Amino acid sequence: MAAAAAASSMAKRKQRKAATEQEVENHDEATVAAEAGPENDGHTAHAAEEAAAAEEGVEREGGGEGGAEGEEGPDAAARGGEEGKEEEEREVSFDELGLDEQLKRALRKKGLDKATPIQREAIPLILEGKDVVAKAKTGSGKTFAYLLPMLHELLKLSAEGRIRKSAPNVFILVPTRELCQQVHNEASSLLEFCTSKLKVVQVNASMSDKDIKVALSGPPNILVTTPACVASCISKGIIRGSSIKESLSMMILDEADLLLSYRCEDDIKALVPHIPRSCQSILMSATSSADIEKLTKLLLHNPFILTLTEVGHAKDDLIPKNVQQFWISCDAKDKMLYILVLLKLELIQKKVLIFVNSIDSAFKLRLFLEKFGIRSSVLNAELPQNSRLHIIQAFNARLFDYLIATDDNKSKEERQANKGNKKDSRVSRKQLQQTLDAEFGVVRGIDFKNVFTVVNYDMPPDPAGYVHRVGRTGRANKTGASISLVSPKENGIFEDIENMLKDVENRDTSCISPFPLLTKNAVESLRYRAQDVARSVTTRDIKEARRQDIKNEILNSEKLKAHFDENPRDLDLLKHDKLLSNKEIPAHLRDVPEYLIDPTTKEASNVVKLSRAAMDIDKPRRRKRMGFKGGSGRSSDPLKTFSAEGKSRRRGRKERDGEQDRRKRKKVES
């Protein structure tokens, strides 16, 4: 009831505002609303609602149920116009959205009070049981936009004793294992503060059938997985189709536009016959595409479409305004030189996420930076799942500041060309037998914490890839920056990106500016050193580094599986930025002599350092935060002290014993 009241109140405010601004265009807007579907009877009210939603920043399209609810006359709208404008500018708290008290308590514990625009719009609609397609930029809060109403409904059913037990009640389908882990962690963190015992599990293709059966025993209320894994479970009889029809009440597709590009179309189609007609479906995406339209027609019934276009009154379509975009023109052979100058002369803020298009490029860059004393780690599809997750956690915990991530996704045209080539399809089957993980994905969905700078060492294959890469910084309204190194061969894709951003933001000038802190003198001062070191990194060195890194991470993965389930805070026991090369690093390469740094570059570097100090970025980390208490630990080890008591308790006991001895001595003396 509370959710319905909140949704109704919001709709009325929008309609009051819209009526004053759309009197002249009511006929045209009504025609647009009439074309949305034959079930829309309240054309004028629906048009007003669409106009109001667009003014606020969320474009809403819907079927029959979204029509003429709560229509008011022009006089009432005129009286409430200014009031509605003030109300819409006011932030909405989670308390106003009608969520369960347990969830509100969990949000308060996490320090969350205000809903983001996509949460403000999507949560009431999902609570009303409507199918929803929500499109919003990365970092806008889409995960909680579906987790909160989903958990609210399950908590309500659990309290009423109406949960069906034959199969999971909710499927959350995501394209990658990393995102699967992230969504599972977010849902679990909310349920920690709930008294109702709801169970959420994740399964993936790397698990054995036995482990999957154990995980699905019960069964759980919420299953987070990939389409390929759930389709495999159905085909093997681990999950029965009849049980899904009986129990499934909600299905959520996160990063929906990426699901089909990850070869999940057949898996999703195999799942469709088992989905009950009454199942509520939700699609979350950062972009619009033909794939979204295909999934919408396949799974949803008369959905509401929410497109987040603005936050307040500042246009903020694809790239947040708090993210500065820069580019540097350079030859492909000079890219390592430019990266060296940016990092060694400290012209960009840490933490830095560097994107490359191949694994060999990633290791070549890592070996190159090692020669200059710059430690980094590589995140790629060859690594074991546990190691990939641990690298992300360690990077988020600032155990190292530079992460090189491989983004192997090809453009849509290349995928279609390869799909029609039989020879290529045979090669892809061989590749599937190798160690590359088809469900690996680092660009989409993964929540990197406090990344300040994203560097496109290699340009992405398409504009959408650029948007998703840059979306790894500037999350949760924090400032960020992106720097793209553009070679002459990449000018075409760079122009496509610029044109897309111009069209979206309706600008004549470029949205991406030349990087202002880099001077020609700074680049030339390190050119000869960089060229000598780059030549020393051979193909053989790269292959050996890849082999050594995989060997190290396999050992790490086995340790991780046994240890970190019980000790999740001990993140720095394993180092992912160890030196890969066995060759001794020349001492003169670690530091840049003062005479090589020109005054302009030195001043720019000082500005970056002062900015970093003002943001408290370089505050020293305490070992205690990572699960270490310092000291030898002898006093608290019962095997070494023959005492199960801690140091403070024994100290108190000694003081009490000493006081008793003094009293005895006084009695004897008297």
From Swiss-Prot:
Keyword Acetylation carried by entry: no
Motif (Q motif): 92-120
Region (Disordered): 1-97, 616-670
Catalytic activity, as annotated: ATP + H2O = ADP + phosphate + H(+)
InterPro entries: DEAD/DEAH_box_helicase_dom, DEAD_box_RNA_helicase, Helicase_ATP-bd, Helicase_C-like, P-loop_NTPase, RNA_helicase_DEAD_Q_motif
A Pfam family assignment: DEAD
EC id: 3.6.4.13
Entry-linked Gene3D superfamilies: P-loop containing nucleotide triphosphate hydrolases
Ranges where the Helicase C-terminal domain occurs: 340-523
GO MF: ATP binding; ATP hydrolysis activity; mRNA binding; RNA helicase activity
Keyword Magnesium: no
Domain-related comment: The Q motif is unique to and characteristic of the DEAD box family of RNA helicases and controls ATP binding and hydrolysis.
Record-stated family: Belongs to the DEAD box helicase family. DDX56/DBP9 subfamily.
Protein name: DEAD-box ATP-dependent RNA helicase 16
